[in-house]
């Protein structure tokens, strides 16, 4: 159920819409957290002990859109995890490239990899494959894990 702030009317959301919205928010927040941890670990490599991590508001819907992959994740679980991880990494590269091009077109892209080796048009870094491999498996787990039942005691 959802109550509209503008009209005060009650609007009923079906279970799938509610699940998708919850997963979108969960993925957006998880993605932000992963990005902040990753960028702060890069600061550590540069010996910047402030460990400052960064992200962008634009990244929330990009990470949140991982929720769209839940049905795909459920079907892929029969494959071995190395195969799934590779497929997910390639899908993330594709999503990163497409979203990066769109954001670049509007001069809003928060990342620029042109100064790094193994970049493609400054939008994706092929050396990030292991990170995207792990991230894909992380989001699979996040979106397919059954909620734990609360014990009464």
What is the predicted role of each segment?
Residues 2-153:
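Aromatic-rich, lipid-facing transmembrane alpha helices and their immediate juxtamembrane interface loops
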């Amino acid at each position: 159920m959802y109550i509209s702030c503008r009209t005060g009317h009650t609007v009923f959301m079906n279970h799938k819409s509610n699940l998708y919205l919850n997963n979108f928010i969960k993925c957006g927040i998880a993605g932000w957290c992963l990005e902040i941890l990753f960028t702060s670990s890069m600061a550590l490599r540069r010996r910047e002990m402030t460990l400052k991590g960064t992200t962008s508001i634009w990244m929330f819907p990009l990470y949140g859109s991982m929720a769209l992959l839940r049905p795909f994740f459920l079907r892929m679980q029969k494959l071995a995890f190395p195969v799934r991880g590779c497929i997910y990494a390639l899908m993330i590269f594709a999503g990163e490239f497409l979203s990066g091009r769109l954001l670049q077109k509007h001069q809003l892209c928060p990342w620029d990899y042109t100064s790094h080796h193994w970049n493609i048009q400054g939008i994706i870094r092929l050396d990030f494959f292991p990170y995207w491999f792990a991230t894909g498996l992380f989001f699979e787990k996040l979106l397919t894990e059954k909620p734990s039942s609360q014990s009464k005691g």
